[in-house]
Amino acid sequence: MNHSLKPWNTFGIDHNAQHIVCAEDEQQLLNAWQHATAEGQPVLILGEGSNVLFLEDYRGTVIINRIKGIEIHDEPDAWYLHVGAGENWHRLVKYTLQEGMPGLENLALIPGCVGSSPIQNIGAYGVELQRVCAYVDCVELATGKQVRLTAKECRFGYRDSIFKHEYQDRFAIVAVGLRLPKEWQPVLTYGDLTRLDPTTVTPQQVFNAVCHMRTTKLPDPKVNGNAGSFFKNPVVSAETAKALLAQFPTAPNYPQAGGSVKLAAGWLIDQCQLKGMQMGGAAVHRQQALVLINEDNAKSEDVVQLAHHVRQKVGEKFNVWLEPEVRFIGASGEVSAVETIS
């Protein structure tokens, strides 16, 4: 139990794992998984560890997916990219823009690897991965069999996909296929983007605006460890939203397909005067209440306690119960984040 996980999670929480293995190709990943499984150890496959909270020491092998490579196919209607799961997401966004292939600019500066992007169906500023995903290539860990899922088969939802359910432990993502249409359409529905002129705006301007919003509002994990948005934006019924808006008319709300309404978790937390609130070494970020940070050598217990406190306060005031977006990892694998902080 002497391999520190601190360098492998952006929260900077100091727990250990029995073994840590970096896999640079599919075969190395399979070998590491099969070796650990033969020894009866649990196995966790990580990208950049930017969406996990380790609750305790991990009693098994952590495999760091570093499968690289970008292939481009130029078709009349779109560019098709085949991207290794271990590629850094933001670097991919920058690369596609430099090469004149826009479409990912709203997703700039999302931390993590390409392989993690479909698991969460990452999204920001009005765009989700499912908008550009063509397929996801996986390998079945027990057999080494390769499987390609179409975007539809990935069953994408809000911060959700098949990879959080039946594909969670049996498969590893090795590559993601993206389709970037040549007829670029800007998405300018959120934040500062609403001020841009859709008729003249360029992809680079959207990218710059997104980077500006993220860097001014969000803490740098190198300075204060964090895992980005800690909570999901809650999606509530039309009735619940109507009652809440009657009482709090300024609450940001985004009607969804099917009649439900998405609320802004950061706003709900902010209304409870929780910005800057600290428990142990963990704190609510002063600029963006949705982010919990490692202010001062936080222990995982500090983060859990703080998340519980935030959830209670928001629940008591608004009767809306927040769910973590961050994935909680126990000694032998993922555990329910909601149960942990309830």
Curated annotation (Swiss-Prot):
A cellular-component GO term for this protein: cytosol
PROSITE patterns on file: FAD_PCMH
Pathway, per record: Cell wall biogenesis; peptidoglycan biosynthesis
Domain of life of the organism encoding this protein: Bacteria
Domain FAD-binding PCMH-type: 13-183
Residue positions of the active site: R159, S229, E325
Molecular function GO labels: FAD binding; UDP-N-acetylmuramate dehydrogenase activity
InterPro entries assigned: FAD-bd_PCMH, FAD-bd_PCMH-like_sf, FAD-bd_PCMH_sub1, FAD-bd_PCMH_sub2, MurB, MurB_C, MurB_C_sf, Oxid_FAD_bind_N
Keyword Cell inner membrane: no
Family assignment from sequence similarity: Belongs to the MurB family.
Reported function: Cell wall formation.
Protein name per its UniProtKB record: UDP-N-acetylenolpyruvoylglucosamine reductase
